[in-house]
């Protein structure tokens, strides 16, 4: 039997000081050494609406752990709000914060010898950072998120009633046809409650994917932050972590550990879900990074193969009119997985923290199945309250009926899919030798094949200026480079350029190609993650104004239509003078420079490139050798 990790600090005469400190922190003497210590990694902050309500959540989870016989020890991580950090120097810190979060959890868990972990996450880089930590540590772990916010609704001056989200406010801000009065109304109502932004943006995409990976309970990704059903989820998470902790330490059952649950097959299932629901392109970056931490040989090529086979079953904002509350009403993630299972697109023997197999838990939680549990039916009736509130589980509204329409409802079946291939596509070609990613679900059909002349910007700021000044016209391919993990550094999201294109009426006639990334709220012909990035000597560094570029999503190609010899000549010149932007002044802190020194391109998940393991580093400490799954 594996010993409790916490015995390192709770047993032995030499640990009298550690035990004294545990008593001083409120642990009863009788519990020290007798009960497992569960680290509760919270991410409460008043900066982020997706996290403002998490302060009491840590206490609820902790109380559930205590009732089940554990010792909860809560601590906090940082949480960057990408929406507030967007469009200025702050966005440079977003992706690097993922690694900082992962490292901080590792530091706390390892320094205090915790036996298990609960991750209370919600927004863009927090769930991925916690996922990296869970894969790295490989101790019993359960994820539970803060939940999505309710969708906004507003009546405009002309009497039109609109459903709103954050992206509406951003795009309408640069739409000259939108009056100041209407913009003020939109701004006031776009984000009416606490929770992660209401569409299928990065935060909600990742919270849904941890359900598919098997590390969270059903309903984690779609139950609204304001609903009382969310409180039940927190209490269940506390009980679940204690159940799997006992299975591991008392019964030597290693099948409950994160790497056993999040196997290669589970990552494949998560990617299938992502493709079916048209999730954020950022999920590709984060799943690749998490697989790397798990020691799995799961690459962009695997995602590319999956993208050609899995159909798109769901279109949620920004790809369509539905919001997360609509996905929940239609049965949530279990319903999407159920449709994929019936279509033969899932590995069904994978485990979860709450079930021995995917088949087993879908039989209970898929409300479209023949005999769903009453608990599932009740959960997916949870509806928005329609009242402005920053308070968690403050309302208990219910839908009159579920959306079980598999032909034209929020979640379709395979026979009525939006497309036969998924909502994301991996493109390759001389402009992206190692790959690029596009959210194809958000691209109008008439833009799936596009050729245009390049307008080159060497920063997001320069790209915004190009759009607002009229330099970008219909038929343009706006190339934004030196914004990759190393070149930015930090791989900024290009939400403002795409939002401004939309606001200026250019989203249907302009493509954007970048080695940076896009917000989960981006739509249109937006191709990101171009690898190798410009700072790593990728072909994108050789593009000049006026070069023709061809994008062919059906053929999965991205080409710079310039002679190979000319490309080689330009890159050779760049090598001599250095792969760096010529027209950008961007002062960098020590923290950002350190990140840039280690960051790899997006096709590797933006993970850190470390020197050979001469000191018995992470590979030795956590046994992260590559495994087949």
UniProtKB/Swiss-Prot annotation:
Alphabetical list of InterPro entries matching this protein: Dihydro-acid_dehy_C, DihydroxyA_deHydtase, DiOHA_6PGluconate_deHydtase_CS, ILV_EDD_C, ILV_EDD_N, IlvD/EDD_N
Pfam families the UniProt entry points to: ILV_EDD_C, ILVD_EDD_N
Catalytic machinery residues: 519
SS bonds (residue pairs): none
Annotated [2Fe-2S] cluster binding sites: 123, 197
Transmembrane segments: none
EC code: 4.2.1.9
Pathway: Amino-acid biosynthesis; L-isoleucine biosynthesis; L-isoleucine from 2-oxobutanoate: step 3/4; Amino-acid biosynthesis; L-valine biosynthesis; L-valine from pyruvate: step 3/4
Cofactor descriptive note: Binds 1 [2Fe-2S] cluster per subunit. This cluster acts as a Lewis acid cofactor.
Residue numbers of N6-carboxylysine PTMs: 125
Role noted for this protein: Functions in the biosynthesis of branched-chain amino acids. Catalyzes the dehydration of (2R,3R)-2,3-dihydroxy-3-methylpentanoate (2,3-dihydroxy-3-methylvalerate) into 2-oxo-3-methylpentanoate (2-oxo-3-methylvalerate) and of (2R)-2,3-dihydroxy-3-methylbutanoate (2,3-dihydroxyisovalerate) into 2-oxo-3-methylbutanoate (2-oxoisovalerate), the penultimate precursor to L-isoleucine and L-valine, respectively.
Name of the protein described by the UniProt record: Dihydroxy-acid dehydratase 2
């Amino acid at each position: 039997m594996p010993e409790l990790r916490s015995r390192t600090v709770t047993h032995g005469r030499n640990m009298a000081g550690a035990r004294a400190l545990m008593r001083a922190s409120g642990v009863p003497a009788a519990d020290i050494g007798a009960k497992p210590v569960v680290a509760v990694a919270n991410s409460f902050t008043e900066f982020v609406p997706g996290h403002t309500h998490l302060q009491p959540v840590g206490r609820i989870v902790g109380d559930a752990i205590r009732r089940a016989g554990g010792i909860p020890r809560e601590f906090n991580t940082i949480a960057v709000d990408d929406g507030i950090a967007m469009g200025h120097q702050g966005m440079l810190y977003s992706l690097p914060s993922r690694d900082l979060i992962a490292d901080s959890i590792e530091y706390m868990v390892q320094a205090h010898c915790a036996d298990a972990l609960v991750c209370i996450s919600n927004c863009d880089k927090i769930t991925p950072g916690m996922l990296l930590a869970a894969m790295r540590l490989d101790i019993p772990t359960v994820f539970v998120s803060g939940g999505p916010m309710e969708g906004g609704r507003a009546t405009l001056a002309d009497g039109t009633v609109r459903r709103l989200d954050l992206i509406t406010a951003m795009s309408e801000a640069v739409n000259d046809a939108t009056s100041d009065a209407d913009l003020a109304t939109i701004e006031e109502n776009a984000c009416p409650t606490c929770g992660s932004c209401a569409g299928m943006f990065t935060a909600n995409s990742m919270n849904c994917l941890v359900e598919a990976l098997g590390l969270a309970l059903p309903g984690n990704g779609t139950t609204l932050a304001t609903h009382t059903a969310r409180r039940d989820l927190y209490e269940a998470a506390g009980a679940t972590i204690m159940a799997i902790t006992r299975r591991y330490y008392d019964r030597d059952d290693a099948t409950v550990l994160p790497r056993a649950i999040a196997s290669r097959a589970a990552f494949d299932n998560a990617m299938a879900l992502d493709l079916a629901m048209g999730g954020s392109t950022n999920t590709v970056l984060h799943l690749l990074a998490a697989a790397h931490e798990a020691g799995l040989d799961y690459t962009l090529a695997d995602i590319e193969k999956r993208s050609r086979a899995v159909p798109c079953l769901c279109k949620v904002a920004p790809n369509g009119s539905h919001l997360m509350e609509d996905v929940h009403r239609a049965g949530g993630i279990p319903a999407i997985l159920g449709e994929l299972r019936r279509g033969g697109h899932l590995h069904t023997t994978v485990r979860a923290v709450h079930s021995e197999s995917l088949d087993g838990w879908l039989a209970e939680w898929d409300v479209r199945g023949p005999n769903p549990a009453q608990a599932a039916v009740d959960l997916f009736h949870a509806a928005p309250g329609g009242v402005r509130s920053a308070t968690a589980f403050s309302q208990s509204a219910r839908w009159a009926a579920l959306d079980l329409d598999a032909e034209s409802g929020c979640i379709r079946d395979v026979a009525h899919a939006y497309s036969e291939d998924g909502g994301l596509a991996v493109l390759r070609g001389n402009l992206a030798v190692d790959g690029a990613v596009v959210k194809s679900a958000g691209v109008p059909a008439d833009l799936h094949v596009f050729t245009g002349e390049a307008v080159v910007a060497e920063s997001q700021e320069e790209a915004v200026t190009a759009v607002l000044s009229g330099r970008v016209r219909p038929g343009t391919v706006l190339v934004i480079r030196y914004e990759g993990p190393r070149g930015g550094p930090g791989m900024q999201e290009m939400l403002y350029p795409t939002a401004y294109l939309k606001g200026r009426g250019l989203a249907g006639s302009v493509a954007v190609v970048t080695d940076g990334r896009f917000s989960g709220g981006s739509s249109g012909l937006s191709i990101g993650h171009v690898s190798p990035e410009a700072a790593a000597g990728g072909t994108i560094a050789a593009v000049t104004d006026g070069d023709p570029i061809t994008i062919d999503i059906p053929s999965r190609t991205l080409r710079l239509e310039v002679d190979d010899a000319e490309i080689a000549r330009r890159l050779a010149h760049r090598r001599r003078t250095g792969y760096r932007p010529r027209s950008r002044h961007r002062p960098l802190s020590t923290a950002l420079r350190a990140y840039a020194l280690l960051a790899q391109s997006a096709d590797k998940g933006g993970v850190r490139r470390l020197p050979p393991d001469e000191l018995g580093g992470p590979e030795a400490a956590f046994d992260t050798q590559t495994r087949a799954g």
